Amino acid sequence: MDFYYLPLSAPCRSVIMTAKALGIELNKKLLNLFEGEHLKPEFLKINPQHTIPTLVDNGFAMWESRAIMVYLVEKYGKQNDPLYPSCPKKRALINQRLYFDMGTLWKSYADYTYPQFRENKPADPELFKKFESALEFLNIFLSQSKYAAGETMTLADLAILASVSTFDVVQMDLSKYEHILRWYNMLKDTAPGAAENWAGCLEMKKYFKK
């Protein structure tokens, strides 16, 4: 199972943690976006959208991290796997959190920070307010349950952990979010693949400081 990735990418790290939780060995293929390796013809044949992470499982190629995470559990997980249980209501809640991470939490972080370290633009206070709003939503979610989508660890936790650990390593102030901190301190060192996730965060920090 070939896995095209960059360690500093939070979406890539969420897939790595999912694979670790399932006991799946990934054949990791480093793809250096900064050198344009994702635009080479051989990779475009695999993924015409030229994004990472990309997974190739016995000739079947797919991308988008959260879709990959769900695929891995559905194909290789246990029946009614706690990471993504078969109950429609439980799955719906996990899906909501996954889409929240993609479309609100991570997006607001990227919208705020990427112009600063990619284009050397000043911080935009309005974009920071949107990021804070996303953190407040997450804090509310985590005030209602032990984990991101209920009382057991699910794919939602692994996706959001990849995001929040990135916020941590670039020194975003999370101190006023009591429930995020409780959850993060519980998982940051104990989640499957936590060490590799943090190593990728440290790579991200180097890039952020450039």
From Swiss-Prot:
SUPFAM superfamilies to which the protein is assigned, alphabetical: GST C-terminal domain-like, Thioredoxin-like
Catalytic reactions on record: RX + glutathione = an S-substituted glutathione + a halide anion + H(+)
Coiled-coil segments: none
Residue ranges occupied by any GST N-terminal domain in the UniProt entry: 1-80
Chain ranges of the GST C-terminal domain: 87-208
Pfam families: GST_C (PF00043), GST_N_3 (PF13417)
E.C. no: 2.5.1.18
InterPro entries reported in the protein's UniProt record: Glutathione-S-Trfase_C-like, Glutathione-S-Trfase_C_sf, Glutathione_S-Trfase_N, GST_C, Thioredoxin-like_sf
UniProt-recorded Gene Ontology molecular function terms: glutathione transferase activity
UniProt binding sites for glutathione: 9, 50-52, 64-66
Quaternary organization: Homodimer.
Family: Belongs to the GST superfamily. Theta family.
Name of this protein: Glutathione S-transferase 2
Organism per entry: Musca domestica
